């Protein structure tokens, strides 16, 4: 299968925090891969900024090191050619130093160009950056990219939205969630709305329940301070899992464009019922001395931490499509395997013509998002042999890597896709301000309830599937989690 390279217009991409970890690990390698793929037009420029006293030569050396370390591909000649697009300006993101110097190269180019500002800095600097870009005459027609977290609760999310809206239109703001840039996450819409096999059955009449699992084997190394303030509910549930829930549950948009898709996602969030306290489980991983693994509290250096590294909950959507069908969501650190999967459990047939001896079986659609991207549909057939009509479940499995060849086995990195979407002006995979606020409005009461009740996370064994209470959450409803598999 031949990959299509969609051309983009010439652009200037200014990276605030251009020497930081995100720029080195994600942004610059993604741009280099698009350069190698032939998607970076002649005249495209990348301008790194930071407070440090570098010059363009020094910055190019830093970029080359980052590409060697984090890209893992490309020849020396390709890297050198890419570096010719890269320059550096010393700019104080929290002050006024360097802004006139930054404006010079941007204004010297003639002709139509896309102007992007990537806020690869701490969220507390977003408002000041937006104001300075505007004050120095660089906001008109520009696009800004901001990274999550988009606030830490509803109040701070509103404050952030208001700060950005004071200088930029919503159509200029791109709130990037790298999870939405994954090829398989986008495939959710294709699976749902491109296959008449599924859409007529995609409702509470036929679906018993839906499970969404995002399991990680890693702990919180390198993010200790942030994570102990945030926890799994803020870091994962409020955004990544919420977005998966929206894509699975939303109504068909009128067309595949940014506002139509985001309108439907917003409707899902607003239709979510408040989560009941007995419908949610928090967990915190324990240490394993034999394996040399620290506990969560040891990892973050806080012996009294009540922050969750795991959360599982049952959600209900009060609309005509999903009333009565529960959604079970779980995510956690230091679990048995790295796995992101959506399991759609269909209902049993209302009556079995084969009798009770044949057994009762329900269909299952499993959508694997990572690491082995693909789809499995469990169907029921007759068991071979002469023992009467005995039914057995068999999987119809499709691996994207096998079905789509090279393109399926090496999909574009999420940052590659999302940065190119910003350049094209496509906001479909970016969260809108009202969507962010609605997600926090649903999340905040849960977190506030934990604080008010003094809830403490349940301990769970490292390299397990999570706390036992999460299994009880399902068993009380006569259901069980599908296994977490690598």
Where are the regions that the model predicts?
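Secretory/organelle targeting and membrane-embedding segments
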Residues: 1-145, 150-486
């Amino acid at each position: 299968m031949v990959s299509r390279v969609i051309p983009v217009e010439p652009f200037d991409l200014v990276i605030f925090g251009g020497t930081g970890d995100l720029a080195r690990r994600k942004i610059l390698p993604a741009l280099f891969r698009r350069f190698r793929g032939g998607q970076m037009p002649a005249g495209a420029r990348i301008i790194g900024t930071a407070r440090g006293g570098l010059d363009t030569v020094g910055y190019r050396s830093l970029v080359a090191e980052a590409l060697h370390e984090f890209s893992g591909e490309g020849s020396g000649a390709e890297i050198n050619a890419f570096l010719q697009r890269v320059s550096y300006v010393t700019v104080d993101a929290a002050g006024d130093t360097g802004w006139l110097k930054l404006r010079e190269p941007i204004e010297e180019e003639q002709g139509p160009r896309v102007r992007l500002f990537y806020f690869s800095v701490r969220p507390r600097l977003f408002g000041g950056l937006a104001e300075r870009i505007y004050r120095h005459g660089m906001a008109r027609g520009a696009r800004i990219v901001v990274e999550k977290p988009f606030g830490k609760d509803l109040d701070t999310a509103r404050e952030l939205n208001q700060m950005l809206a004071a200088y930029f239109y919503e159509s200029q703001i791109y709130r990037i969630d790298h999870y939405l840039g994954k090829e398989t996450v986008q495939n959710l819409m294709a699976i749902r709305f491109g296959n008449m096999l599924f859409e007529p059955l995609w409702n509470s009449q036929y679906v018993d329940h839906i499970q969404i699992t995002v399991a990680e084997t890693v702990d919180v190394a390198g993010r200790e301070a942030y994570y102990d303030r945030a926890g799994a509910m803020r870091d994962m549930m409020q955004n990544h899992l919420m977005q998966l829930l929206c894509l699975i549950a939303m109504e068909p948009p009128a067309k595949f464009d940014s506002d139509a898709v985001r309108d439907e996602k917003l409707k899902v969030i607003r239709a979510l019922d408040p989560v009941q306290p007995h419908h949610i489980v928090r967990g915190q991983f324990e240490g394993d001395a034999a394996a040399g693994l620290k506990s969560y509290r040891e990892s973050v250096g806080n012996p009294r931490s009540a922050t969750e590294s795991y959360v599982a909950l049952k959600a209900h959507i009060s609309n005509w499509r999903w009333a009565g069908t529960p959604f079970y969501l779980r995510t956690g650190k230091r679990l048995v395997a790295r796995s992101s999967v959506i399991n759609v459990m269909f209902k049993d047939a209302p009556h079995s013509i084969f009798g009770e001896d044949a057994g009762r079986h329900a269909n299952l659609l499993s959508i694997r998002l990572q690491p082995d991207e693909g789809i499995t549909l469990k169907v029921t057939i007759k068991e071979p042999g002469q023992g009467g009509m005995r039914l057995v479940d068999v999987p119809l499995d499709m691996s994207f890597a096998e079905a789509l060849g090279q393109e399926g086995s090496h999909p574009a990195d999420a940052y590659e896709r999302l940065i190119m979407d910003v350049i094209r002006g496509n906001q479909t995979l970016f969260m809108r301000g009202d969507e962010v606020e609605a997600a926090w409005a649903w999340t905040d009461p849960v977190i506030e309830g934990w604080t008010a009740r003094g809830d403490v996370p349940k301990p769970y064994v490292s390299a397990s599937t999570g706390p036992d209470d999460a299994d009880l959450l399902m068993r009380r409803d006569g259901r069980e989690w599908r296994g977490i598999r690598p």
